[in-house]
Amino acid sequence: MHKDPSIIVNINLREAKLKKKVREHLQSLGFTRSDSGALQAPGNTKDVIRALHSSQRAERIFANQKFITLRAAKLIKFFASGNEVIPDKISPVLERVKSGTWQGDLFRLAALTWSVPVSSGFGRRLRYLVWDESNGKLIGLIAIGDPVFNLAVRDNLIGWDTHARSSRLVNLMDAYVLGALPPYNALLGGKLIACLLRSRDLYDDFAKVYGDTVGVISQKKKQARLLAITTTSSMGRSSVYNRLKLDGIQYLKSIGYTGGWGHFHIPDSLFIELRDYLRDMDHAYADHYMFGNGPNWRLRTTKAALNVLGFRDNLMKHGIQREVFISQLAENATSILQTGKGEPDLTSLLSAKEIAECAMARWMVPRSIRNPEYRLWKARDLFDFISNDSLKFPPSDEIAKTVV
């Protein structure tokens, strides 16, 4: 049977337009090609990384414009201005976030203000608001979710084989949202937030929610325990996460860098077009990959579409390496993950309140004395990315009266 020539022409035109769109997008971000054909980023400074994420962030803001317009004016009262923060009175507390609540809306809004878009997480997830109990303002955010299956620096540290990783990865999580909001970030609040990963509160919450996790493939109970949490700096090397120690306890340890592979330079709108292209070809990666639709699936789907279009595999290597850290909640975490034997040693695992007190004395109060500029911060400045015409805030003296 002869194929209709018009169908072939339409497919070729679609491919040509899609290939052109990919090339033009990468060029707009400043990517070039080396003599060997490898993709080259325009640099690796923090400003360059923010610029590379700009289109992805713009898409995220646009997609959430209605939500921002409806909720920001009512939720702004939970964001602090500098003059509302009294450093020696700061009292950090954790609140776990549940879906469908105003706390969930607050988490979503706060995450949208960051210059590098955050993931929504995959699989198992625990989200937290970190409050300043002294004034009812938001200090920062924590969210942990399922880790990626392949992470070389993590796997080399633990020293497990493929079988061990498959059976014991359930005891690991990844912090996909982690950071402090202004003005607390100026007081090194990011260090406080990062230290809270290694808290008894997270360990116990995980045990309650996921302790009886059943494997998707094996359908067997995993008896999961939160032994360690990884996280990755969004800005290359992290000055916030490095040397995080309190009273001799190491809260985060740098274990190396990612290989510079990923899909952040392919925005959602372009990914959808690539996926639709695969879908029309009945490609297996278009709608699912094996037992999930997490980060590996999106990476594989994008890679598959680019390969079909004739691009090289190395188009997924953007070259931006990110520093990887691990927080070991149990002193013997790596040993248990490697061998599957032993009970977690939690003798040095403190409560969030105890950790917060140490972090306040170690970093935040001294920083407030050395750098009093945090007092100049205005909560409204956090929403500069929103058009004044689309967002109407109540007068300053009415913000405290606004009801969620």
Swiss-Prot record:
Biological process annotations from GO: defense response to virus
Domain of life from the UniProt record: Bacteria
Tagged with keyword Zinc-finger: no
Keywords: Antiviral defense, Cytoplasm
Keyword RNA-binding attributed: no
Cellular component, GO annotation: cytoplasm
UniProt subcellular location: Cytoplasm
Function (record text): Component of antiviral defense system Druantia type I, composed of DruA, DruB, DruC, DruD and DruE. Expression of Druantia in E.coli (strain MG1655) confers resistance to phage lambda, SECphi18, SECphi27 and T4.
Name by which UniProt lists this protein: Druantia protein DruA
